[in-house]
Amino acid sequence: MNYIPTQTFYGRRWRPRPAARPWVAPPPVYYPPPPPVPVDPQAQQMQQLIAAVNTLAIRQNGTRTPGQQRRKRQPNKPKRKQTPPKKQNPAKTKNKQKPQPPKPKKRKPGKRERKCMKIENDCIFEVKLEGKVTGYACLVGDKVMKPAHVKGVIDNPDLAKLAFKKSSKYDLECAQIPVHMKSDASQFTHEKPEGHYNWHHGAVQYLNGRFTIPTGAGKPGDSGRPIFDNKGRVVAIVLGGANEGARTALSVVTWNKDMVTRITPEGTEEWTALVTTACILSNLTFDCSLPPCAPCCYEKDAEGTLRMLEDNVDNPGYYDLLAASTHCDAPQRRRRRGLTEDYKAYKLTKPYIAYCSDCGNGQFCYSPIAIERVRAEASDGMLKIQISAQIGLQVDGAHSWTKIRYMKGHDVEDTDRNSLEVFTTGECTVHGTMGHFIVATCPEGDSLTVAFVDKHKVRHACRIAYKHRVPVLGREHFTVRPHHGVELPCTTYAMRTSVTTEEIEMHVAHDVPDNTFLSKTGNKVKITPKGKSIRYNCTCGSKESGVTKQDKEFDNCEVSQCHTMVTAHDKWQFNSPYVPRAGSGKKGKIHVPFPLSNSTCRVPLAPLPNTIPAKNGITLQLHPVAPTLLTYRTLGEKPEHHTEWISESCERTLPVPEEGLEYTWGNHAPVRLWAQLTTKGSAHGMPHEIFSYYYGLYPATTVAVCVGLACVILLALSASCCLCVSARNKCLTPYALTPGAVVPCTLSLLCCAPRAKAATFAETAAYLWAENQTVFWMQFAIPVACFMIVTYCLRHLMLCCRTASFLVAVSLGMGATQAYEHSVTLPNAVGFPYRAHVDRPGFSPLTLHMEVVSTSLEPTLALDYVTCEYKTVVPSPKVTCCGMSECAHQQKADFQCKVYTGVYPFLWGGAYCFCDSENTQLSEAYVERSEVCKHDHAAAYRAHTAALKAKISVTYGSTNGTAEAFVNGESTARIGDLKMILGPISTAWSPFDPKIVVYKDEVYNQDYPPYGSGQPGRFGDLQSRTTESNDVYANTALKLARPSAGTVHVPYTQTPSGFKYWLKEKGDALNHKAPFGCIIKTNPVRAENCAVGNIPVSLDIPDAAFTRIVDAPSLTGLKCEVATCTHSSDFGGTLVVEYKTDKVGTCAVHSESNTAVMQETSLSVTMDGRGTLHFSTASASPSFVLKVCSSKTTCTAKCVPPKDHVVPFPANHNNVVFPDFSSTAVSWLTHTMGGATVVIAIGITIFLIVTCIAFSRH
């Protein structure tokens, strides 16, 4: 379902045209009013001045004297109609009616509100649940939209039966509007200039991308209401709000140009109207916010109130009932929340004494400030400590910042908060305290101690083994927040004591045995409660037992026969594993302050490195202040990823290949660099300069060519020498064997031999002409044939050396086409343009420019589960004295339960048992998601087929624009009247594996166990579908152990969290090692700007884009002169064209050769006959055909290599193995080969001549 509506009809409700009524008189003819008389500005100012003076005079005349008292203005009373008095019976008198207070007058809606109400009358409908309005649904475009969190059914029979599709990402439900209701829909717009907009309650301000209203203008129940602009178009739909003091920030769903956006400020609450929940008390159902008077509140009936809360602990309205039970003054009226209000729930609780393994002296004890739990989920290093004492409360439960209350025996006492100490290896900084909780920042250490001094000047402490290490935030170590740096997202414990989503369980305290209340006088045993509730059990006489608050005596009894216990069931205490559980298993709960919240933390920025560029590399001079992380990767198909922590000043040389390098230093943004084809020497100089030039670019090829050339020259010399020696031997051998023979003059000159008798050349030629003319002509044909063969080979060798080169910033240029339907193939690389020249008969050529702006490869994901850190919940053990207990299975993750017998001796420790045998302890433990799971969790997904979306910039003629479409061969995109279809892409590739893990903004390609098959200590040991669902699965190897004699506790063993282990061993994320330079992002998971494959594009160019030849300028005498040229460096060439024209205009510019590409797509033709253009090339001596309008010319240049070794932009290079030779290099090569060829030709010629002469002699 697309959540962008289609605008099909924007009118209000359609009304039929009234039928013709001939009997009704026609309306009068309308005459336009006369034109207004022009107003004189001076006369108008004079009239305003006279009116102001008259008004001032009237006010002065009505002013009272200084001594006159101001009379109170009486309200206007309606005059009663006077009636004649009636005779009244004096015996009967009427009771006087009490005057009724005037009803408050309703405020008249303002102009904005009236306008919105008029539009809302047709386009919004109420959503009702159990007859009560919970929100609204809105008709926008061709869709009906309703917030997903608004429960209920739309109050319309046609809309109620629609099938809605839900989007949890946008918190929206969407369905198609019935056809007969499309006229009621409102228009929508994505245009949102900053200013004021309208909604049901007045004005809405839009500033810096946020919608805000005055606090109090919106309320729960407004979810789903639209926000309109001044034209009545919907710009957003309200979902909720966040109170920010004087103003409230709205959470809305709005539209951008091509997508839906959800704006959710921090602390947003959903504005759905809450349906009143019902609580139960003794089969009586009542509103949770209005409990009955028995019990009405905690002060009137403490135990009854706790029982009522325990019975409704799982009710959704529990906290409403808790708040109402702690406010006995006026529970029905609205209460203003404050700091004191947040402490109200602690009236129902009390501190407690619990087991501590080290009370500061190396010995265990039962401490009033025992440490229950230490939490360190905050990424800024804060600790959240839970203790058994309560901070910020007095003895009576009243709020006081300066007090700590604690248990002393059976009584609650308080002392000064200033005596509170928290330290590890050093003193901690306490940021906030409330109830059982302390938030502090501590130095690193292996133990944690909390201590205080009571009012009797006795110091109480508790120390536990806790390894505290401050987490590294960002990519640089630091100990103190810097003055200057960069803000990174982090988590911290917010200093808020208001109601949160976290809670702790409470229960009624166990009865505490104490025989100090017993005394004996004579043969009587007396119980003196001393103001407490005492549970007694005496085995003497009639075996009496019960509960008393008064003194009580037993005759004929001994103190040893009676047992007394202090029972107090009017207070809750924390469900601690170090305190026995009460007899009843009921429990309550209260909120936990200081919730873990998302925030931003300032982290330092290391000094920027000094960079020294080199050929195909860069040297970084690093000077870190603290240990700083350096990472880099190449951007090719096989990325090489490296990570290193730098602690001291040093230098690191990084290779920069042609495909690019990305490095990240500390908390700075990533830097991308690309290598350029820089070299020494010159392609147009002397041979040694040419050798240096090509050796710097293509060392292997240059060496191979030089070695081959040297071999050819040596072979030529050797062959020529061999031929000469052979010819000499053939010439001289016959004369050497004949005595007295004289060598002819010709042979003596050719063979360097003394003259002998032989025929002369003329005689030999005459002899061959007379005897064998065939051999005579062969003497002349053989040298000519050799010369022709050598010339032909040299010609083709020069043509082969001039290979075609790739463009520096472009793919290959396309040829001309004869129709407006055009197909191109774009490289899937951001920043590389494509140019083409489209020819159409009767029209001037049209230059087409296309460039990929961005791409996004988004896979289809299926969530398997979410995993995070677990929390082990250990309830208070259930100690049964003189009896047995049995485990009851509970639907909890990794639930464990065991019963241990004989663990407590008679009257021992905190077990409070009076039997010396058959004392049992029931231990329980299970696993839950930790509170940090909402902020720190990993999601396991199965990735399917990925869809590629590309944004392409197109320029043709005078039209340019950007379009975005899926690259699938079907989706259509338009820019003006241009229609194009992208894809499918040539290479179906995705950087994502079939199974991926998403953690915050990082993605990992890794396998994971399926749901329900997690292993202890590994990824997936705790699994759930979402961070709030109840389907929690856990396998943590949780095992209960037998408690040791001497303490009340629940020992257990458990494998450490597999999620935390995975965080340490997860390795490098795909974000840092994705191939082809992909940028990996989340929400949604996608890979952006992956440079792989090609994108075919089918274009349908409109006829209006072409210019007829008769309208285009005509150019003659077109000439091209290259001013400067730097190859392989963006558009580093500049050329000047000269021409003659008959009129001014605009001509399309295009290079018809693949050697160069033009930066400009058109040239403004002027009567000056001169223009400047820029081009890009990868050739050292390019020669290309430039076409301007219908005229052509050839441009030739001699280019120099770029000077910068490394640049921050990508550039393609000539990647062929055999390089492109310059004309100068080819000239020198031709001369060298020609010299070797001449040497060989001379040797061959001599050999052939000698051979022919030898044949002629025989």
UniProtKB/Swiss-Prot annotation:
Residues 338-696, 759-773, 818-819, 820-1234 are extracellular. A motif (Nuclear localization signal) lies at residues 68-109. Residues 363-366, 399-401, 521-524, 553-559 are annotated as: Interaction with host Mxra8 receptor. GO terms for cellular component: host cell cytoplasm; host cell nucleus; host cell plasma membrane; membrane; T=4 icosahedral viral capsid; virion membrane. Glycans are attached at residues 283, 537, 598, 960, 1089. Residues 41-75 are annotated as: Host transcription inhibition. A lipid is attached at residues 731, 751-752, 1252 (S-palmitoyl cysteine). Belongs to the Old World alphaviruses that usually cause fever, maculopapular rash, arthralgia and myalgia. This is Structural polyprotein.
